[in-house]
């Protein structure tokens, strides 16, 4: 992620791509972003693409609008998702990282299936906190054909995810969304006792307080801009419930483990 310094000239030849070796081998985003292809799919992205200080095409990752248009272009180009958007201020997830998570989940499922990654909608995933972007169900369904139950405590986020599904008819048969009315419950109120699932996934709130969340945001933005930032701007967005909870991610995961015992026969 680098800062941008000059307008993007029209390039006739595509530069040699550089592989992101840390990403999963099955990840579609291991190479540098192909901005020519992305702009062809999503012309609105073009005004955010610049030449950075290394001479490469990039966007300003500290700019929330640029990040949102990049996500829209990636989802449309690689996952055939039309009209993707999220409400202002909601978490705008980095697509390559979320795709990596799904591919590692696939390997985990394969490890209990004689090394063969299971595909098709008979595989059911429970996504705790599906978010406004519906990102894990989108990638999991497109890459492996899995079906999903997505839970969410925020009605506005749930409505956003539902709109994305309705805009893309192929998702409607495999993704079901449910509102969690009690924020302290993770499984109860979402799952039926006899309802089978193969795996539970989650992107838990990382931070233990709003102050910690703001401090880490300032640190990240300062790194992106190569200078100290004193006013936080959430380039990837995020509501409070998406960014922090009491006890942070460790407490959240412990609660998941404890509450999952009530549904131990659902797997």
Task: Kindly give the residue locations of the regions a language model identified.
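N-terminal auxiliary segments of SAM/dcSAM-dependent transferases
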Residues: 2-92
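Phosphate/oxyanion-binding active-site loops and adjacent basic polyanion-contact surfaces
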Residues: 63-66, 93-100, 245-253
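Conserved alpha-helix/loop element of class I SAM-dependent methyltransferases that forms part
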Residues: 73-78, 96-124
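Extended hydrophobic secondary-structure segments that form protein cores and membrane-embedded regions
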Residues: 90, 124-130, 178-179, 200-201
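Buried hydrophobic packing segments
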Residues: 101-105, 137-140, 256
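Conserved class I S-adenosyl-L-methionine
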Residues: 118-131, 149
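Conserved SAM-binding loop of SAM-dependent methyltransferases across substrates and taxa
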Residues: 132-146
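S-adenosylmethionine
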Residues: 153-155, 162-163, 167-267
């Amino acid at each position: 992620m680098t800062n941008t310094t000059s307008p993007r000239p029209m390039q006739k030849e595509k530069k040699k791509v550089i592989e992101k070796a840390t990403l999963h081998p099955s990840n579609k985003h291991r190479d540098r972003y192909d901005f020519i292809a992305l702009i062809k799919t999503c012309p609105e992205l073009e005004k955010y693409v610049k030449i950075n200080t290394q001479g490469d095409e990039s966007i300003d990752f500290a700019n929330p609008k640029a990040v949102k248009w990049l996500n829209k272009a990636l989802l449309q180009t690689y996952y055939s998702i039309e009209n993707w958007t999220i409400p202002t201020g909601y978490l705008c997830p980095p697509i390559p990282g979320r795709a990596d998570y799904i591919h590692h989940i696939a390997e985990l499922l394969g490890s209990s299936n004689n090394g063969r990654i299971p595909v098709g909608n008979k595989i059911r995933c429970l996504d705790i906190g599906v978010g406004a972007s519906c990102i894990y169900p989108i990638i999991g369904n497109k890459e492996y054909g899995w079906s999903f139950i997505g839970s969410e405590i925020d009605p506005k986020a749930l409505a956003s995810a539902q709109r994305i599904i309705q805009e893309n008819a192929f998702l409607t048969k495999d993704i079901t969304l449910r509102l969690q009315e009690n924020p302290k419950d993770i499984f109860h109120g979402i799952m039926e006792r006899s309802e089978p699932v193969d795996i539970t996934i989650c992107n838990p709130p990382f931070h233990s307080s709003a102050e910690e969340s703001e401090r880490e945001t300032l640190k990240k933005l300062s790194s992106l801009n190569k200078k100290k930032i004193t006013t936080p701007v959430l380039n990837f967005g995020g509501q409070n419930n998406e960014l922090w909870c009491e006890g942070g991610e460790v407490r959240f995961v412990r609660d998941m483990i404890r509450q999952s015992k009530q549904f131990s026969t659902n797997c």
